[in-house]
């Protein structure tokens, strides 16, 4: 199982050719389970499309790729023969949502207000740096994500904004004090993922084990935010073998 940004690829960019070929080989031997705070569409852009276009991954191989979006609160798997497909060609419509645990409108509003007000309190609400059409706080259905510079900011700017995580740790701490029923975890380069308490990556990994009928000892996890407060840390706490990259 893998985190995505800073683990498989540079933040917010598609996986490189070398990684696409490596994952293609792994799909012949293992069940591959990326788990991230990203929304489903980003999994397609950053991973699936690259596997198909660069590494010529087949629908049969994709049946072994399990996408756990929004920290694992959404799970998608590929059905090669769905929609009258004979299984010989890839069709994006054949991704099936197995489950989803969406936030209510009221929960989204509470989290959004807590993140925005906390960032403004400490001077880290940088709306003036957004590109046209971009936003700092994004509703990802089962999760709300704060991206300090927006989704469209350049990679260099993102890396430079909070390399030691101190800005986001402070925002997350303040937001948690405002709405204690929710969790706030640092992720990626400029992000904070917010969700109901307990619906972190350990929730996703537990569902992964249930869906694939495997035990903790069967899993090897790769991630970059394995420190306390990072969004990979709950996996470490579960006792799953973890490699920090």
Sequence positions of predicted segments:
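Short loop/turn segments at strand-loop or loop-helix junctions that form parts
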Residues: 1-5, 69-73, 78-80, 140-141, ...
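A short, Lys/Arg-enriched amphipathic alpha-helix followed by its capping loop at the start of a domain
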Residues: 1-2, 18-30, 178, 211, ...
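Asp-based phosphoryl-transfer active-site loop
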Residues: 1-13, 34, 67, 205, ...
């Amino acid at each position: 199982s893998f985190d995505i940004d800073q683990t498989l690829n540079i933040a917010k960019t598609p996986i490189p050719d070398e990684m696409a070929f490596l994952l293609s080989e792994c799909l012949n031997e293992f069940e591959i389970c990326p788990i991230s705070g990203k929304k489903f569409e980003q999994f397609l852009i950053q991973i699936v499309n690259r596997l198909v276009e660069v590494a010529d991954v087949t629908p049969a191989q994709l049946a072994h790729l399990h996408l756990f979006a929004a920290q694992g609160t959404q799970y998608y798997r590929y059905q090669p023969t769905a929609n009258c497909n004979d299984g010989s060609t890839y069709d994006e419509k054949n991704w099936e949502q197995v489950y989803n645990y969406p936030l209510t409108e009221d929960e989204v509003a509470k989290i959004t207000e807590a993140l925005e007000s906390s960032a403004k309190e400490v001077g880290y609400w940088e709306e003036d740096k957004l590109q046209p059409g971009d936003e700092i706080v994004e509703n990802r259905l089962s999760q709300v994500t704060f991206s300090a510079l927006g989704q469209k900011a350049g990679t260099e700017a993102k890396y430079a904004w909070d390399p030691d995580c101190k800005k986001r740790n402070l925002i997350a701490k303040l937001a948690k004090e405002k709405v204690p029923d929710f969790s706030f975890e640092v992720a990626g380069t400029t992000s904070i993922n917010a969700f109901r308490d307990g619906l972190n990556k350990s929730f996703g990994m537990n569902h992964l084990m249930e869906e694939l009928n495997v035990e903790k000892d069967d899993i090897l996890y790769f991630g970059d935010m394995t420190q306390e407060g990072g969004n990979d840390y709950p996996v470490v706490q579960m006792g799953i073998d973890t490699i920090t990259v």
